């Protein structure tokens, strides 16, 4: 099993546990250059809010989308968009990524801006 397959296996297990909770989830994905966050409804069929370093407003503010500062900005934006969509509490889906660095920065920023998980 290679590194990617192991991450996807962890993600599958996490998503199965989150599905039992019957609540919206904050799904995070990262690449070397960008970070993406989505609020997905409890059925898993609809995206309620999304933010990424590919958005035009975000690109203007950042020199690099692949660092902890960019992740913190995305965490702040996703929390604001979630509140606008009426979502206050979510389950955090780190997609099998280690809770460290950019993933942790995004989660901390989202919590500071009023998203509960």
UniProtKB/Swiss-Prot annotation:
Listed SUPFAM superfamilies: Translational machinery components (SSF53137)
InterPro entries, per the entry: Ribosomal_uL18_bac-type, Ribosomal_uL18_bac/euk
A Gene Ontology molecular function term of the record: 5S rRNA binding
Keyword list, A-Z: Ribonucleoprotein, Ribosomal protein, RNA-binding, rRNA-binding
The protein, known as: Large ribosomal subunit protein uL18
GO cellular component terms, semicolon-separated: cytosolic large ribosomal subunit
BP GO terms, sorted: translation
Function: This is one of the proteins that bind and probably mediate the attachment of the 5S RNA into the large ribosomal subunit, where it forms part of the central protuberance.
Family statement: Belongs to the universal ribosomal protein uL18 family.
Assembly: Part of the 50S ribosomal subunit; part of the 5S rRNA/L5/L18/L25 subcomplex. Contacts the 5S and 23S rRNAs.
Gene: rplR
Source organism of the structure: Laribacter hongkongensis (strain HLHK9)
């Amino acid at each position: 099993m290679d590194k990617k397959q192991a991450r996807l296996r962890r993600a599958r297990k996490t998503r199965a546990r989150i599905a039992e909770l019957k609540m919206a989830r904050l799904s995070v994905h990262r690449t070397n250059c960008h970070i993406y966050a989505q609020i997905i409804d409890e059925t898993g069929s609809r995206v309620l809010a999304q933010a990424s370093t590919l958005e035009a407003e975000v690109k203007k503010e950042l020199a690099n989308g692949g660092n902890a500062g960019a992740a913190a900005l995305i965490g702040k934006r996703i929390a604001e968009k979630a509140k606008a969509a009426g979502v206050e509490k979510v389950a955090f889906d780190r997609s099998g990524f280690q809770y460290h660095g950019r993933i942790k920065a995004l989660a901390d920023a989202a919590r500071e801006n009023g998203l509960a998980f």
